Amino acid sequence: MVREDLILGIETSCDDTGVSIIKTSIARDNPEEINLDILSNKLASQTELHDKYGGVVPELASREHLRSLLPLTKQALFESDLDPSCLSKIAVTTGPGLKGSLLTGLNFSAGLAAALKKPLIPINHLEGHVLSAFIESKSSPRRNFPFLTLLISGGHTQIILARSEEHTSELQSPMYLVCRL
């Protein structure tokens, strides 16, 4: 027997708006084997807008997310040939990131989850980077925990210990080590 989930993912941690729908299939007798299909992956870039100002303007980023979220979600559902009621869960980035951008994505996702009576799954942006190695192909690679990874993303540089999918922790920030020298 296989458990399937259709998950809508919302990403608004900085200046790009991302909406994706994935289908996961997990064999009940072998939960280590997860098959993933990316049904839709939509992105609205704000690079051109922010380039005029020499960098990301948080208030503009939040407004652009607000303009982009509903159309991108509709496009993702259409491209996936899904009715919103078919979704199993809604996942949303909850940090770290720009507060206004995160709140825009969270409020949109929470409203959608409440309207559809679906669970809302908070996602740590940095943990998403760490675990993204497992979704590079339709059949995800075997998860060999624990593992160490060096994470460099935006203003974050960290050495992360991943004990499991649910348990990751920062061992040390290389910047902290440099400052101590």
Language model region names:
Residues 1-169:
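Short acidic/glycine-rich loops and adjacent helix/strand connectors
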